[in-house]
Amino acid sequence: MLTLSSLDILTYDGQSYNISWDFIATEELITNYEVDIYRSESPVSGISQYEIVESGLSANLYSYVDTSISQLLDIGRPWFYKLGIHDLVTSGITYQPEPAAYLKDEVPDKIFREIVRRKNINLNNSRGSGRDFKIFKRRTWGTHCSVCWDSSLQRTTDSNCTTCSGTGWLNGYYDSLTIRGMKNTSPKLSQINMFGEWKPSDSLLYVLGYPPLKPKDIISDDDNHLWTVVQVRTIERLGYIIEQIVQMALLAQDELLYKQLL
């Protein structure tokens, strides 16, 4: 079975993604393989929450241009890709890579790598203040909810819809991703000023650049409190995200999401 050595996502025009891949050297015939391309808004494991973009491509092509996202490249809306690699001789299939690839997920230089390594050590130090958090990526594309979606207004009419969790899309949130982060419930005034409007119940969350977060994503802490992402500020090097500083708003305990996500 072929094994990916790289899956790169690039964009040159802001209207499409250029997807290119390469395989680890092998004696197998590459003509015995076909490739399917899958896409999702969340880098969840497995393939069930990914949609197929293209199927039956020759593995020997090594690249594909996804133009179907020409209207879906909104700011703060990352897309994650996997390949389904079919062995035409044995009918076997594997899905790679794990985790999924996305735009600008590579390491630009050694300095970037070292900064991320040190921050990762601090977050995972048992003597530090790093904690486990679960991220529920909000769906912003797919099949509209048949219960609450108003096609004229182009929005949901029920924020408490039990079918779509008030998102307007079926299966409104993806499965959870576990990450390490540091929560600050009493930020300094200089930190608050980065975000503007601030409520007493809001908190800051410091996480690394993966997975990239966007407003309205849901975060669960180790006390089973749910928070919604209000704003995200990033620390970058050479255009690549090192760290995300997230303003979170605490959700009331009677919110429907507590029953649906926890």
Outline where the language-model segments fall.
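Pro/Thr/Ser/Gly-rich low-complexity, intrinsically disordered linker/stalk tracts
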Residues: 1-31, 90-109
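Recognizes extended acidic, P/S/T-rich segments that occur
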Residues: 32-77, 88-93
